[in-house]
Every structure is written in C-alpha cells, then in structure tokens.
Amino acid sequence: MEKVAFKMEHISKSFDNGKIKANVDVSLVVYENTVHTILGENGAGKSTLTSILFGLYKPDSGKIFIGEKQVNFKSSKDAVKHKIGMVHQHFKLIENYTVLDNIILGNESRFGFLPLINRKVSEAKIKTIMEKYGIFVDLKQKVSNLTVGQQQRVEILKVLFRDSNILIFDEPTAVLSDLEIQNFLKIIANFKKLGKTIVLISHKLNEIKQVADTATVLRLGKVVGSFDVKTTPVDKIALLMMGKELKQTKNTTDFVAKDEPVLKVQNLNLFLNKSLAYKFLVRCNNIHKAQQIKKNKPLKDLWIISFLNKLTTSNKTPKLVKGLINKLGLSYQENTDETISFAIHKGEIFAIAGVEGNGQSQLVNLICGIEKAASNKLIFNNIDISRWSIRKRINAGISFVLEDRHKYGLILDQTVRFNTVNNQINNRPFSSWNFLKPMEIALYSNTIIKKFDVRGSAEGSAVVRRLSGGNQQKLIIGREMTKQNDLLVLAQVTRGLDIGAIAFIHENILLAKANNKAILLVSYELDEILALADTVAVINKGRIVGMGKRDLMDRQSIGRLIMQ
C-alpha cells in the first residue's frame, strides 16, 4: 500500500483583504516516491499553494498533514525541519557569494562552540551529495559566474544539503535551454529512483508526460481535476487547464518586402564589445585602460579588438584568464572577427533561432542599447542609432520585451498601474506640465489588464511582486504591444506562460504584424518560430549560419544549422 507523503485539506488563501482569492477549498494527496505535478493557467494559485506547503504563507483555512501528522508551519524553517525543500522560480541566491557559501548559508557547520564556520565538513557532505545524485557544480565559483542551469543546480544542492525528502520545484524549466531541460528531467527521474517525493509546477505538458506520475489541475484557485498522467491524453489535460479548446495560431501569410527596412543591422560583432572589454579589464586590474573605455576617451575600437584577440589566442594566456573571458561572454580562438547583418521590414516577423548562449542575448542588448558594440551600425527608420541611449531608442519608437523581466521590465515594488506606464509616464496623456493624470493612467492601465488578462492585479492597485511570474510577463507584453511603435523586439516572450496565454500572445504578435509593425522574435522554442516567422535566421557562435523564408527553413534544416 502506498504511503502518504503529505496531504492538504480544504486550503483557502486570499490577499488584499479578500480581493484576490488565490486558493479556494483546495485538497490534494501526494504519495511517497512519486512525481506529482500541479497544473493550471498563470494566476491559478499553483505557487501560492506550494508556498503554503513550504511555510511562506499561512492559509486562511484548511489543514496540512506530513505523513499522518497534522502540522502548522509558522515559517519556512518549520517546513525545512519536516524535510521539505523548495526551488523557487526566481532563484534565492547571493551572487557575490561562492557556490559553497550559498549552499550552507543558514545551516553552517561550526568548530564546537566557536563562531567559526567549518567549511571542510560542509564541503565533504556536499561532495557526497553531488556524487550520489549526479549533480556537479564548482563549489569555489561565484554564483555570478554561473549559467542559469548551473544556478538551478546550486538551488537543488541547497535543499539536498538540508536532507529534504519532499522537493518542490516551481516552474523549474522556464529559464532553461533545451539541453538543460533534458538534464533536469534526468535529475528528477533519478530523485524518484532514490526515494524522493517531487512536487512539480509546470506548464509544459510534454515534460510532464515524461516524468510525472499524477497531477492536480487548478483553475481560478480551485481544483478541477486529479488524474494519472500516463493514461490521460494531452488534449484532455489542456482542456482541464483552460476550460476550453485552443485554436492553433499560425502565420499563413506570404511576406513580401515593399518598403525600406525599419531596422538594418550592419556588421555587428556579438562577442567583442566595449562593455565586456571594460568588465574584463577591471577584473584584470587594468583600471587605467578600463576607465579610458568607460569615459569614451580617444581609444581606438580596433585596439580593444586587437588586445582581446591577442590575449585570447595566445598560448601563454593562463587558463584562469581564458575562463574569465568565457564568463564575460567573450569568444576566443574562433569567430572573433565574425559579424552579422540583416534587415527587418514593416509587417515582417524576423525570427532568430539557435541554442541558448550563441549570442542572442548580446544581439538583443546591442539593439536595445544596454550594451555598445565595438564597431557596428544600427539603422532605425533610416537613422543611425548605434550610439543612442536606451531612453532615446524607446522614444523613437522601439518596444522591448527582454529575457530578464525583473531586471529590465518591471519595478517589482510598484503597482501594476504604475508599471503599465513606467517608461512613458512623462508623456501625454499621462502627464501635463509635470503633473500626473491619475484618471488617464488608470484608464490606460485597466485596458491593458483586461485585454491581456493580467490576473491578481486588483484593478491595478496590486504590487507587481505579488503577481505570478506568468502574469508579470503578460503585463510587460501588454504594455509594450499597446504602444504605437514601429519595431517590437521580443526575447523569450512566452517563457513561463501557460498554453492559453502563449496562444493569446501569438495572436497578438500576428495582429502586430497585420498592423505593419516590424518584429524581431528571439526564441529557443522551435515550434514558436515555425508557427510565427516570415524569415528565420539561425545563429551559431555569434554568427548567422543560415537565413531564409519560413517555407524554406523547416525543422530539419534549422536543426542541422544549429548543430554545425
């Protein structure tokens, strides 16, 4: 007979004095040594429910049992004592600390009664855990130098270090590349073999089918179904999640360029740019040269490229320095002289395909103005904007939806209403003579909230930090797509969204195309690119290795180019 790992009975939770009902009379049972997934749309109450299980929130009503024993968690410390661990969607790591210090933080081994940390004991335990579960990370590295996938492994090691038996993962694959996703799914399968109980929040039904045993579906905070994953068809799961059948969204028009390009990218080098050179020189303690770059002193761009090329290709360069160059996103020994060029026209969806880490982030950052390239030209509506600030580019008519929504898209401790206008608040009709117009802002904000179904917003008064990750993303997308701009730059625009929200965003991208907007779509989801793009460019190691119309760029040809 299966043993109960935990059960939750009649759990209810609301926020903002009952305005937002996150969970309504939710009950579920999870058995030991199984993978149980919690499914639902963005804002369905999945993260709230697991946060209650982890002690981050207290339920308004209901009971929690670990095994057969009822518990009352006052904080996450109580949950940890009961062998529950949680890996959050947004990692809780200190970037300036090493991997080792992040793992042991709050649970350090001491030298007897002395206030000194015994790192050797902790390090030995972590290495044993890494060997047992096949999860390896360099313990001496700073977290700031790790990839997203490696940071996730640090979070997993943190919960294993605390001897957790019930492991909760909130949207674990939302920020991972395809290869990292496959590695993560192997880790989950291994956890199950070794006796762990897994709770998985995800929107990706193909991943759920691979690893989950059972599932519970939430809709508007209520349970609408529980079932065996292996025997339930994907279509039925999607129907339970959405409450309706979804139509497939696909670009069926044949694009023909009729006008001058809205955006021309000329001779852009994705790996050698001033920003990264500056960081590199600071790390190498060459402060004088670094300051020259930062202050735009008369220092030839060619010098930077020459310096870096000589340094990175030299056999005398220490491995430590070459490793540092890699961490900064620089390429060495190949493709340092490669540049890319392309153009995007009105009414065109120009998609960038490729495996993560091949220059996509650098490309978007250079177009947005976050980074300045060593030598390039960016022509927007026949004007060279290469040296323009981010603000000037926005005011000129470029909209951005970037990968890191917390860093570049939102002010988390401000309201939803403020965030709908935060990069245009000084413009009409939202202000006049330096005075804000609250009625105009509220009207505009409510239009975006309703059109893009931003749930949990309390008519714009809710703090953005309170929203689910998917609803935060919908807020940014709604804000940027509502602007009357000529160019949309969309990077990983549907990452973290449920299947219904993805279909809705795809419809709006095609609507923007129909309204003659030029769209740059950067995505690691090949299905998304094939469904939406007019033109597909495949990027590999910082250069375009293939480009063509959608009809000529099928899955096989794109796959071959990606793997070159």
From Swiss-Prot:
A UniProt-annotated Pfam family: ABC_tran
Record key words, sorted: ATP-binding, Cell membrane, Membrane, Nucleotide-binding, Repeat, Sugar transport, Transport
GO molecular function: ATP binding; ATP hydrolysis activity
Topology of this chain in the membrane: Peripheral membrane protein
Main location: membrane
Subcellular location: Cell membrane
GO CC terms: plasma membrane
Domain ABC transporter: 6-245, 315-564
Amino-acid positions noted as binding ATP in the UniProt annotation, renumbered to this chain: G40, E41, N42, G43, A44, G45, K46, S47
SMART domains the record matches: AAA
Keyword Nucleotide-binding (UniProt): yes
InterPro entries associated with the record: AAA+_ATPase, ABC_carbohydrate_import_ATPase, ABC_transporter-like_ATP-bd, ABC_transporter-like_CS, P-loop_NTPase
Protein's job: Part of the ABC transporter complex involved in carbohydrates import. Probably responsible for energy coupling to the transport system.
Assigned protein family: Belongs to the ABC transporter superfamily.
Name of the featured protein: Putative carbohydrate transport ATP-binding protein MG119
Organism from which the protein derives: Mycoplasma genitalium (strain ATCC 33530 / DSM 19775 / NCTC 10195 / G37) (Mycoplasmoides genitalium)
Source taxonomy: Bacteria, Bacillati, Mycoplasmatota, Mycoplasmoidales, Mycoplasmoidaceae
